[in-house]
Amino acid sequence: MLRKAFRYLVPVRCKSNSSIAGASTAGTSPSLPQTLQRRIEEIPLERYRNFSIVAHVDHGKSTLSDRLLELTGVVKPGAKQVLDKLEVERERGITVKAQTCSMFYHDKRTGLDYLLHLVDTPGHVDFRSEVSRSYASCGGALLLVDASQGVQAQTVANFYLAYSMNLKLLPVINKIDLSVANIAQAEDQVEDMFELPREDIVRVSAKTGLNVADLLPAIVDRIPPPTGYVEKPFRALLVDSWYDSYLGVVLLVYCVDGMVKKGDKIVSAHTSNKYEVKEVGIMYPERVATGKLSTGQVGYLVPGFKNSRDAKIGDTLMHQGRESETEVLPGFEEQKPMVFVGAFPADGAEFKALDDDIQRLVLNDRSVTLQRETSNALGQGWRLGFLGSLHASVFKERLENEYGSKLIITQPTVPYVVEYSDGTQITVTNPDDFPDLTLRRTKIKNFQEPYVEAIMTLPQDYLGRVITLCDDNRGIQKEITYINTTGQVMLKYDIPLAHLVDDFFGKLKSVTHGYASLDYEDAGYKPSDIVKMELLVNGKGVDALAQVMHRSQTERVAKEWVRKFKQYVKSQLYEVVIQAKANNKVLARETIKARRKDVLAKLHASDVSRRKKLLVKQKEGKKQMRSIGNVHIDQEAYQAFLRK
């Protein structure tokens, strides 16, 4: 059913594969690299299997990865979240970076050894680009479905992404040990929605290990080996990169053709820069230097450069002197950020150190865009672009966890398009750059805002509430599909991206008591009546707090803003007026009364002339202070206001 609707679902943005910053061979047996390389050399290319695990978030991908690593002897039994290497992943229980690991499997049916390469991919839609980059090195994928929840929105999206890249799909029903598991229903969904044969489905419990051993022969039998030529010149696809404080930049590559060894001279097709390979090896699950990589393998190499900008994801690496006979690989589609925030150091003195930390983290997450900006209120900072609001939140958390850096993050904004009367267009990602009212009246034809096609699956009991939620967020209904076998319904709405990033998923979870799932695709731009909202303190705009929004939201938001900001501004020696303004019209106002200083405290009661003179002087002083508008606002006030 859904396979036939493929033309309506556009594959999502594209991105990366592994993080593993700081991993090394330290602590491993000295003989391990030689042992692994000897085993690899004994296995021909036709017995390689590169595969990933894709599913909706929380359907058990990382747990299943742990069990496969145990069965193949990579880790000891009982290991948890082996491939979730980031602290934020372990804390949140989600996969943020796609992680890789090589495994050896001995097939008892034939007595043959196989080299398996596993990629554990993220499930959340903000990290879909991690999934698509992972697919570039894979011949197939395990499509994982939770037996208790069935097919969810991101299951559908992941299926079509894999289908569009011609991957062989192996359906797996997980969590069959749960008392609420409905295995037959999940099988019906897989068969009806994806047209995958019921007899191909493997039923497992990743948590208990039940039937997981049956997956390995299924992977060997149903997923094809890599297509490449050992005798051709070396050609590798740069899939990901990260920074190691000792080695510098480390590259994760998929060796498409030929072979690369330590000491080889290689060249980048993108930059034409030449390097010598300082170290090369596989992930097992940490870095293990094996001395070389051959056709079909996914591993790492250390090119010996320190500048993170030299590592372009999707680049083709080849041997020096063989450039003319080596075809450049197509690479990946460039990332398009969907959410932008202003980021400023909590302590202005930390700007330089924080800039270095951000540059290193961006190396490991190339979907983040970065440019410098300056705020009158918050000082020097950056305008950062992300794939979604969760992506922005995780980036901030990683910066704090991995580098100890503290940031002030402004409200997220989305890229708006301004079309002028002469036909030219500009994209505005910073509210400060939004055109003023005089231009709007004379030179601007229209404003356009980005929309997404939101795909939601939910129980039919909550349909009315979700439709109301979508209508309240200016959604445009496109399609309702009733999934008869499950009592579920699938909704498709076009929703403004600005509303999606304003915790739409949290609101959806709230009205459905956690039973809804959400996925979304870019749906282009639509004309819209949008305006810039500013917060003014004594008539001066606070640039860091400005936002662009639909005109219908302005009155409600204006009242919320002034009421909230008043809580965090301390009283001054003169009156402080807080206003919210949009389209040159003040929509809301709050006043903080002046804090009176008793200048007469030390005077004698009978000294009337001196009394009058001091009161007049105080009045003139307050008038001068008010005209300057020098209101002192603590950094904590901005942080508290920007906090949800």
Curated annotation (Swiss-Prot):
Q: Which reaction does it catalyse?
A: GTP + H2O = GDP + phosphate + H(+)
Subcellular localization, per the record? Mitochondrion inner membrane
Q: Which GO terms describe its cellular component?
A: mitochondrial inner membrane; mitochondrial matrix; mitochondrion
Chief site of localization: mitochondrion
**tr-type G domain: residues covered:** 46-227
Q: Where is the transit peptide?
A: 1-14
Protein's membrane topology: Peripheral membrane protein
Q: Which family does it belong to?
A: Belongs to the TRAFAC class translation factor GTPase superfamily. Classic translation factor GTPase family. LepA subfamily.
The family database entries (PANTHER family) matched by this protein are listed as: TRANSLATION FACTOR GUF1, MITOCHONDRIAL (PTHR43512:SF7), TRANSLATION FACTOR GUF1-RELATED (PTHR43512)
Please describe what this protein does. Promotes mitochondrial protein synthesis. May act as a fidelity factor of the translation reaction, by catalyzing a one-codon backward translocation of tRNAs on improperly translocated ribosomes. Binds to mitochondrial ribosomes in a GTP-dependent manner.
Give the protein's recorded name: Translation factor GUF1, mitochondrial
Q: Which organism is it from?
A: Eremothecium gossypii (strain ATCC 10895 / CBS 109.51 / FGSC 9923 / NRRL Y-1056) (Yeast)
